[in-house]
Structures are given as structure tokens and as C-alpha cells.
Amino acid sequence: MSVLVNKDSKIIVQGFTGSEGTFHAEQMIEYGTNLVGGVTPGKGGQEHLGKPVFNTVKEAVDQVDADVSIIFVPPAFAADAIMEAADAGIKVIITITEGIPVADMIKASDYIKDKDCRLIGPNCPGVITPGEAKVGIMPGFVFSKGKVGIVSKSGTLTYEAADQVVKQGLGITTAIGIGGDPIIGTTTKEAVELLMNDPETECIVMIGEIGGQLEADAARWVKENGNKKPVVGFIAGETAPKGRTMGHAGAIVGGDDDTAEAKKRIMSECGIHVVDSPAEIGKKVAEVIG
């Protein structure tokens, strides 16, 4: 069992023939991901990396039954790519693109809310189910199969947490990089919920950062639903000055509850095992799994 992507997922790359799309598609194919083709308008009918190129996502869905898309489209066109994927019937839309204008994301987010799809990102590292599918830009060798799920706003800390968990001999079920923009498709709570409902996931690592309410919402949901599985939490940005964007466009402290300190307090009150340093994540997971 896994969430979002697995060995049966039929994955396409939007922005397939561009430099980013090409590089990461090669890595995904090498990993063993079931990549069935890609989309570059105007290049339909060609082959790239031994896979078919389509002019539209609809063609890819009709011809190769694509159900997952990963987007490497420049920021100005990325919201359109998201909406096109949703229109065509893609079930999981993973958007790597950074710097999509907020106004565009408001439009795309509103457009897809009634569609039968799930958006991950934008500005995220993607999703990996070790040994089955790597749909993103993460280094595949860091991850191995196991029983710990990861939800993270930070790409780098996703890899760090995975490395520590694997070194504890526990491994990963699915790691979900949700992205650090102000408007994202799947929230921390929704990603945690997916892993809570996955029978193979025995523990969840939740990595957040300053800014917004996502981690507090997730923590309260975990408590309200009876703390069914242990959750280990870390919040990045404790030393960030108020009012300044730190790394991610969404990482800006607005109110008192946006600070790392406030988030850690809320998480602890909700029964989450909070660590003060990312270096402690692996040990804490091993401790709570027992």
C-alpha cells in the first residue's frame, strides 16, 4: 500500500522536452518509475527519451491512460498546465515549478476544486513511494521502503528526514513534499490524513516552517482523530525575524500563531512528538515506534 503514487501509476511529464523536464524524467525512468510519455505543445508525434510526446494532456490520457502528471513548465504557463491536467482527467498533479504568480494560483486552485484530482505543490520536490515510483526531483538513493510516512514543506528537510529514518532501519512508505508557496494544492493536514489512512504507515514525520496555519490545523486534526499513529514534528525557521520571507514565499510570520515557537507549542499540546533540531528526527521516530 502507498499513497498518491505507486508502481501502477501511469506518469507523464508536462514540459517533457525542456531541460528541467528532460533531466528529471531521465532520473525518474532510471529509478524505475512507470513514465509513459510527456507533453510539449507542437512536438506531438515525436519520441523523447524513448517515450511518446503529445501535444496535449488529453491526448496522453486518451492514448496511454496517463493518471499522474508532473509539471516542469515555466512559471508564466504553469497554472494553465495545472488546469489542463485537471480538465483532461489526471488524478494526481504534481507541480514542481517555483515562482508561479499568486494570482495565477488563486485562479488554478479555484478552477480545480470541483474536479476529481489532487494537486501537490507548487514549488515542491514531489512525491516518492520508494521502490515503486519517484515523481519529483528528490535523490532516489536516499529513500528505501519501510513504515514511516513523511509530509514536508521543505525539499531538503524531506531528504534529511528520510536519510535519518532509513539509517534507523525503518524506511519510508511515501514521502510527500507539499511545497512552500502561500497557495498550495494539498495542505499538511490533508497529506497527514492520507498517511494516517494508509495501513502500511506506522508513524508520520511532519516537517513545517514559520508562516501560515497549516501545521496547527494538522496537529488539531491528529488530536481530534484520536492520535491513531505517532507523529514526529519539526518546525524550521525558529530564528527568522518577523515580517521577512525566509526561503519559501509562504514562510513569513504574520501573526503570533505563525511563529515556530507557537506552532511547536500547539503541536505538543496535540500530542505530537516535537523535536528542536532536524538532527533529532530519526532518533525520535525510532523511539516512538518502539
Model-based region annotation:
Residues 1-290:
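Catalytic-core regions of core metabolic enzymes
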